[in-house]
Design a protein with these regions (language model features):
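Active-site C-terminal subdomain of aminotransferase-like
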Residues: 1-55, 159-160
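Generic secondary-structure signature for well-ordered alpha-helical cores
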Residues: 25-36, 47, 51-58, 77, ...
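Flexible, glycine/charged-enriched surface loops at secondary-structure junctions
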Residues: 34-41, 57-64, 98-102, 134-145
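Conserved PLP-binding catalytic core of the aspartate aminotransferase-like
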Residues: 59-89
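A generic structural motif
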Residues: 70-74, 104-109
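Short amphipathic alpha-helices in soluble, non-transmembrane regions
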Residues: 83-92, 122-127
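Conserved PLP cofactor-binding pocket of PLP-dependent enzymes
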Residues: 92-107
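PLP-dependent enzyme catalytic core of the Aspartate aminotransferase-like
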Residues: 106-160
Length: 160
């Protein structure tokens, strides 16, 4: 068998079975939810998170007319370091968000499972409490309340 291996028409690599199964599941979920409902859930989730971030006292980096629904960029509070805030979020709350190249901002991805209500509450709470741990004066409760009030636009989109 070894002598004829290279001459045969066999595919001699392992197929990416986990990737194929993951793609199948992702497409199944999209078909089940439908694209219009998925897009609307992402839009509502992003607007709600943006409102919560601003209500707690943080400033968003991008002007409202230019914002995307897929990522939220947050200005790092004065006299703090985004890497330190992100480290606290990771270590204390098991929440990962991104920094940026060249700018001291924090970015929260707003796609897929992040646009589920329980994940929105978790990331906003982790962000607020991590900033407070670094001495930033924020009203985390007000931010959480604003997030919640923006999510009730249509609860159907946010079923977990």
């Amino acid at each position: 068998r070894a002598q004829t291996f290279w001459g045969s028409q066999q595919y001699h690599y392992t197929a990416p079975v986990p990737g194929i199964l993951a793609l199948h599941e992702a497409l199944r979920q999209i078909c089940e939810e439908t694209l219009p409902l998925r897009f609307e859930r992402h839009r509502i989730s992003s607007i709600a998170l943006q409102a919560g971030i601003e209500a707690m006292g943080l400033r968003l980096f991008v002007p409202i007319k230019d914002r995307l629904n897929s990522v939220v960029a947050i200005c790092t509070p004065k006299d703090t370091d985004s890497a330190q805030i992100r480290k606290i979020m990771s270590n204390r709350f098991n929440v990962e968000i991104s920094g940026a190249f060249g700018l001291d901002i924090m970015r929260i991805g707003q796609m897929g499972e992040q646009c589920r209500s329980h994940n929105l509450f978790k990331v906003l709470y982790a962000l607020g409490m991590s900033c407070r741990q670094k001495g930033v004066d924020l009203d985390v409760s007000l931010g959480m309340a604003e997030l919640e009030s923006n999510l009730v636009i249509d609860p159907e989109y946010l079923v977990d």
